[in-house]
Each structure stands twice: as structure tokens, then as C-alpha cells.
Amino acid sequence: MQSWLESYHRAQKAALDSVPLAQVDKLVSLLAQCLREDRQIFVFGNGGSASNCSHFATDLGKGASDKVGKRFRIISLNDNVSWMTAISNDCAYEDIFYYQLQNFGRPGDLVISLSVSGNSPNCVKGLDWAKKNGLKTVALVGAKRGRMAEIADEVLVINDTHYGRVEDAQMTICHMLCYAFMEQPAIAK
């Protein structure tokens, strides 16, 4: 077991080392711009990526907002079960994000989607709608990149295909984004 744990630990370090810090820095700038311009930020994903989106929305919306003195307008589209079940029941599961974006998204807003494969149909459809309607789009994906990487304006690739390691690296990126504002609130100006 020790050997397996060491191997997993090495692979996780490699996944974290693959995080493109220049792209993370660019995303910090996009978030700061959204804050200054009072833009809405939408995040969404499935499974573990959905959990990361929820966590990110909480940390940015509460923790980072408390530090910078202005509120980030961020919402995780996978948190409203009533919306998701109504849309998936009446339309299709792949429509759950883009339908919500139709109601709430406006040109200039920011959409960030997390997916290990980059091919989740609901994430692809949400990003595609957002881009076609003037929202800024970001895909945070694993090494397979997928369709999302072809659609998004900005792409952050974690160079691994293992779901656990990519999801852990996603959360590390989300924490970097939040703590950039918590620990250096002047960047919000």
C-alpha cells in the first residue's frame, strides 16, 4: 500500500505542477474585471467538478468578497436542484446549464466550466451558448481537453486524465483564485 500511496502522491504533484500559472493569473484578472464592472460570474460542472464549482462560488462569493470590500456576483448553476430537474425532465439533461444562462447571462458576464474530460454535453452546450451570446468563457479541463477546449476563450489544462487528481487540481486552482483576493485584496482595484 505504501508504494501505491507514494505513486499516487507523485502523480498528484505532477498534476499540480502542470497547472498553467500564467493562465491562472489571467483568470484572476478576469475575475477582478468582473468585480469592477459588476458582472455576473457563472460556474458549472458535473460530479466532483460540480462540487468544486459549489465550493469555489462559496469561497469567492463569501470569503474573497469579505476581504475586497465589494461583492463578487457568482453563482454555481449546478446548485439549484429545482431548475436542474425541471429542465432535465421537460427538455434534456444536456440543457440544464444553457437554459439557466438564457435567463441570467448577459454579454460581458463570465462563464467558467469545470470538466475532467472536457466533453460533458451539458457543459459543452452551456459554454457554446455563452460564447455565441457574448459572455466570456473559460474551460478548466483535464489532459483530454475535449470540445470545451475548442469552444472556450480561455482554457486551463491540467495535464492528467485521472478524475481524482484532476478534480483535486481544479480545487487547488479555485483556491488560488479565491486566496489571491483574500490575501492580496488590492488586486481587486
Question: What residue ranges belong to the model's regions?
Answer:
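A charged, well-structured terminal subsegment
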Residues: 103-104, 164-189
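Short glycine/serine/threonine-rich phosphate/pyrophosphate-binding segments
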Residues: 49-54, 119-126, 148
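Glycine-rich, small/polar surface segments that engage phosphate groups of diverse ligands
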Residues: 34-105
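Generic N-terminal amphipathic, Lys/Arg-enriched alpha-helix
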Residues: 1-19
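Glycine-centered short loops/turns at secondary-structure junctions
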Residues: 38, 108, 134-135
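Short, glycine/polar-rich helix-capping loops at beta-to-alpha or helix-loop-helix junctions
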Residues: 140-152
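A short, well-structured juxtamembrane/interface segment
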Residues: 19-37
